[in-house]
């Protein structure tokens, strides 16, 4: 049977891998220790320092603790990790025992041996270790063969009983809740199963009669098991610790016959807790039977028992808990009632028992009251008393009278004594307790009667003792004294038994030892309790002393024993919840404080004799009379005395004076006497914690129980002896390293070798002689010596391994050198072959050989195909023939089966006389044999034919598969040929098309070049014109900037101008007379208008010409774009086919020099391609490799061509882009011209309107001219101030540029550092990959060594078993030899003393004895030789195993060190990754800031250019205006000669002044804002620069520190890796296995390199951007110098602009307002944009958080789904198993029914035969004796058949029962799986709902983000609108400048 496949095996013994893992931890016997801890009992520590009596211990996580040496306890080597027997521990101490139990309990290994003890810890859950399969494992096995288990101890007891013919006992002790009752039940079930198995064996040997089978419907084993429900119902209750606690002790004796069959059973009980009937503590409950009665299992039971109240109203049982979680009282009552039936309780007995239970509940509700002024109690209501009396079957009045006024004897008379209420209540409680105790006694007696089977001899028994363990509570009373006294007795029994066995072994081994009886250690405490004048004697004495109290008892005890007895002490003051104590007693488990309250009453246990008399007189209740039958009241004793019967008198006296202590002591003495007559086995139950939590150990609680259970006491005894022992061969084999020379002797003589080895160790002062003893077969060691030997062995082994490693390294380096030389030679050969192939590949004959060879092979393939087709046809014919033969054989078999069936039918139908039946049966049997022979032959032939048919079918399938493969290959070849031809045609077509396109492209390129030259000339001209226009605009802008200073004065002038205009309106009528002059002026204006129109026509003509050219160019561009798109489509197709050829693309990129060279090279390549294509047609039938090569060449060529096309496309696109730029410039010029045209048209209209008002302005011209002169001076002053501010701005801008350059340089340095960090990171990752590969290789090697070690260990175990068998044979031979010697000595003494034998006879006897002795000696020598050989083999294998194990350990250590280093590498790399990521983030931030600053700088530069242009324009305008002002001044000085011209100019100047004023306002505001922005930018740049410098300094320092640290780490790692590489060179043998992993890692490395390259590209791009910014800054500096020059020129021209100022003011105001509106809207949009950005950032963070949560939820759902699928799989498996079992069950039922029918048929046949036998007997004279004899034989045969079938039916029924049980188990498992599935389904639904909710939230967040994005886009649109408005304002300013230029040209 494969034990390890059993589901319960993992809870019994660890696997080999787990053992090796546990035993591989580091250990130092001198440093690893245990130290006390308040929570965990003991914790592990390492001694770091010793100072006097104190030691400093490191306890993990850097913590240290200083303790005294006395409290430190040694730690055992890893060899003893989770050991199954704690007595083998080399350091036997409390800490090691606790740790071993804790470690095993954590692995759910709940059973552990401790010498003779079996310690079991309550697991608080169901474990599959009590099943039938587990029980069968342990049957018949030795204790050492199997893991610790209750069944192992039970089976050992059973085997000892059968083999030694000695009674056995199993002592199960422990605290309440530790699992005593459950273990007792398991023991009883195991013995019942073993007995039943023995019963089946016995029944198979000797058939039972039908009468016996009918009688025995319920087996004895079932009845034994069914005693548990009855005893648990009446003796178990809920306590705080245990829901089913046994409140009594029991000793169950199971009697067996000599054959091992269960014969009978009887039960004895002890110390029943009677007080629980009337009193329960909080959290506890009364006995189960009281609550089962209320469960309504029997519907009318409560009515019959008069229980008409709820259970909570019955005082005796309702003082605490009423229900128990997890226990159904109804189901329990059903089990109890069924057990009553199985145990043969009659319905009347059951009912009477229930009635007595109900009567006690009614008694608890009886109430009494005190009569006024009397010491007399009376009933307070009689309903409950009447119900109780009815249940008792007595009169209620007599019952109440007996309670309130009992009869007592006063002198010689009997009188009724009055009782007070306290006495009555005490009497009621005492009666209830006494009655329940007697009911329990009756139940046990009844069970014993049922289990007392007759007819089977009771030769031996196994007793199971289930009794409470030692108890130390806060309040210890009379009950605790007796429980502790019993445990003292049991511990003394154990100590005596344990060391008797121990010292018997010492005597057998012949070592020196002084006998010690450790049982005497407890004798003092036992004598204190039970001896005369002891506690029990004084308690009994006080019970008969008048007026004695509990205090007088306590005082007498103190006076008698305090200070006189060592175990009697004065109690210490109470602590915490402890109660007051009267005295203390020192037990083996500790000192217990006892309180004497109520001891006298509990000991006397008085009963009301009058009530007992009333109950004994019951006529309706037989049970109550029976339970009180043995009780003799005082009246009965007096009556018996009066009659003069001495026996009665003696009986009455003993009944009156028997105390509880006397009864307990009597039963205890019987128990101990019985145990002393048995061979004991000890089981100690442990409760792990008070919380009933599985897997949790409360160290203090467990240590206390180990003390109370005697486990630690047993360890104390072991320490005084030699607890560790090793066989001589094992010792020699394991420690041969310590004394190699002496160990050689040990191979032949193990004992001598062991002695010599130990002597050498003593001589070397490594051991002391008193620490060990050498026995006959074993070496005995004191505690701790084995650990010392292990340390010595490890040291020697380490030295040997070091030398071995050096040799191995040298050997592998030699192999590596040889391998490298071979590799170099192979590389040279490969290079030579490749060179030869490169020369041959262009040789024509070699190409021809390549073409011809496939054709030769194709011909062979066709021939092979034809042969295969012929073979297939042959095989098909053979298959058809074989199928026909098979069909014929099947028909013959069917025919034979049919004939057999017919013969059987005829056989059944034949019913004649006995002789005819016999003859027919004989004939039928012969025919049957013949037919069976034929059938067998036919079956064999059929099997042969079927095998042949199967083989033929296999061959047929193989041939068909080969044919199919050949067909497929042919088809593939044809398809490949067709595909190659099609590809060739397509390639040729593509090549021709591409050549045509190339020619077209060349033509187009030449045309484009010509057009480009022409366009460049035109662009040059346009560029010159644009430069001139820009210069003019620049001058105007500069003038505008200077005029902005005069805005404030201009505003005042505007107000005055408005007033003047009002005056002018009044004087309009006066100007009508001057209309003629205006008409003349109009004619002049018409003339100028016609001139302007002619100029406009010329401009329009030029524009039309340019438009035509532009359209032509656009058409050409569209044509080119269309061609390029077509080229792109074709190139895309080529790219799809040639995407994998990167190397060719790089070569093509490097191969082009210029366009003509590219064309020539392309032509050559096309020619090569054509030749390659022709060769491709010829080589179409070659191998796939050649076809692949051809495709590769084609793809390379096509790729080069595609890349050339890409270059052409790029050049064409560049040309198109240039043309597009030119077209855009022309379109812009056209737009400007159209705008100027519209402007001129508007000016003309305005001039026409201004003529009407010129007359009004003449009078004011002089006054305005004078005002202009004043304002001009003011404007000059403001212009000077503006120039100074502009110079300041230029200087600040220069500083900003220099700072920007510094920042760029710093960014470059930072990027260089990041590149260095990336290189270092790549280096670390490479080293990490190398270390990982080495670690994986070592782990595989370690696995191989581990497997080898396992195999050797298994062989070693087999050899050990063989040696043990041989040793046993040797011992047997030795015993026979010694026996013969003894007999020889006896004969010799007899001869010498008595002379009964003569000399001849004596010589003959002597010869026989000598002959026997020589034979035995020869056998012994043979056994010794065999043992020596086996030991040698075992030693050799053990040495090999140890060597392999050491090598595996070394590799494991190396692997662990590499793993640690790998983890360190991982940590270092993670830190570097984190730092690099931080640097990337900082770099991104710096680059972002740099981009922002560069953008702002660019914006400032643009604004600066705009301002410069405005200033320059304003300067020009100012100059022109100054000239005009000077001319006007001259004309005014001349008089009114030019009034008309001045009025016209004044009107124009006023309009221009308004426009200039608006432009000036706008320019001034823009300049102010730019100045503020410049200042802010300067401050921000300085702050950013300081922060960046600070960060760079910190990072540089941090980089330097890390560089130093990592350099040191790299150096140390490099040194370590060098040494490790030398040591691990042997692991390169598994390199092939790791190639797949290496490929994957290389792919990952490629991805990482690609990512690194992308990062480097990004860095280079950023560097390019920074360089561009630097270039931009340089250009800005150049422009600044130009601006300074323009500014100086503008200052010279500023005086000219005075006259134009007033007109510019109005326009500048409007522009300023528009600008402010735009700026405010822009600011609002920017703020809104910032808010949206922040919201987007928050939403992005929330989204990422939600994504993380969703990922977590998805992982949870995935785990839940996996667990769900696993549960479903388990459910399906369980369902399939259940279905299979159901099918088996149905099959067994059908078989059982069939057997039943056959049985009935046989019975009818027997009846018929019986009738025939009767008829034959009647006709005996006629038929003769011979017929009768034959009939009787026939009858016996039928009877034997009937018995056989009956046995089969019985076995089938048992099989059916087992199948039913399995079905129920599987149904339970399916239900559990279904529950788990439902739970998982609920979890999945919850997670799904949560996921949906989070998805909804994510969608809402995305919607919100989209809305914000739409808002952002809206703001951006409004911002663009504002920019357009600003552009329109600039255009307005351009118009002003153009007007100014026009006026200047006119003048």
From Swiss-Prot:
InterPro entries: Kinesin_motor_dom_sf (IPR036961), Myosin_head_motor_dom-like (IPR001609), Myosin_N (IPR004009), Myosin_S1_N (IPR008989), Myosin_tail (IPR002928), P-loop_NTPase (IPR027417), XRCC4-like_C (IPR014751). Residues 856-1947 form a coiled coil. GO terms for cellular component: cytoplasm; muscle myosin complex; myosin filament; myosin II complex; sarcomere. Found exclusively in the pharyngeal muscle. ATP binds at residues 174-181. This is Myosin-2. GO terms for molecular function: actin filament binding; ATP binding; microfilament motor activity. It holds the Pfam family Myosin_head.
